[in-house]
Amino acid sequence: LPQIDYTEPLGKYGRMRLVYLKNQRPVLYNRMLLNGTLWPHLQDVQKTAYAWLERTMTTLLDKYPAPDKERAQLLWVAHMNGLKAQAEEVVVREIVYQ
């Protein structure tokens, strides 16, 4: 096996992609593992996913503005959690499971 530098830990989306490749695309997983391209691919997916998440959250906040945080803290938290769940759903579907 090739020597790979594992200095940067994988985040949530990188780990999700790893599990997806192992379970759903084992031939691609093994090829990438043997070629030494798996770790860079997982890091790239992770960076792309976080960029998409940030961009999607911004778009959703523009489309669905949050209530005033000072007056309605619980509503604001619920609203932001809902938007984050929607954004994560998009990221997982479009980036991780493709």
PLM segments and residue spans:
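C-terminal charged interaction modules
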Residues: 58-98
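Short coil/turn segments at secondary-structure junctions
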Residues: 33, 40, 71-74
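Short N-terminal mixed-charge amphipathic segments
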Residues: 1-36
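Metallocofactor- and cofactor-centric catalytic cores in central/energy metabolism, strongly enriched
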Residues: 41, 50
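Core catalytic machinery and nucleic-acid-binding channels of phosphodiester-processing enzymes
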Residues: 45
